[in-house]
Amino acid sequence: MMKGGMGNLMKQAQQMQAKMAKAQEELAQMEVVGEAGAGMVKVTMTGSHSVRKVELDDSLMEDDKDMIEDLLAAAVNDAVRRVEEQNKDKMGALTGGMQLPPGMKMPF
């Protein structure tokens, strides 16, 4: 009886691992757009945190360099935050809302 229960548990773990691998692939293909300055700076980032595109509104070219740098940093940070939200939502759906200890990420 114990053997069957352990086998079933292992099967479930393998299924979850396969689902998580698929979800990670999907997340890597996903793109989000982070914005700053009311959309004057946009950064497109993949789910694996690769920046694909940076867009600057033409009106920024008249402004100072420091402001542009600040807006770029803010847009990148916004994109990172959005990627993390997508990752959390996707992985949370797979784990059935199982709460992990702080700092622990899936997969283990």
Swiss-Prot record:
Q: Where is this region: Disordered?
A: 87-108
Oligomer status and interactors: Homodimer.
This protein's name: Nucleoid-associated protein CPS_3743
Q: Name one GO molecular function term.
A: DNA binding
What is this protein for, i.e. what is its function?
A: Binds to DNA and alters its conformation. May be involved in regulation of gene expression, nucleoid organization and DNA protection.
Which InterPro entries does the UniProt record give?
YbaB-like_sf, YbaB/EbfC
Q: Which domain of life is it from?
A: Bacteria
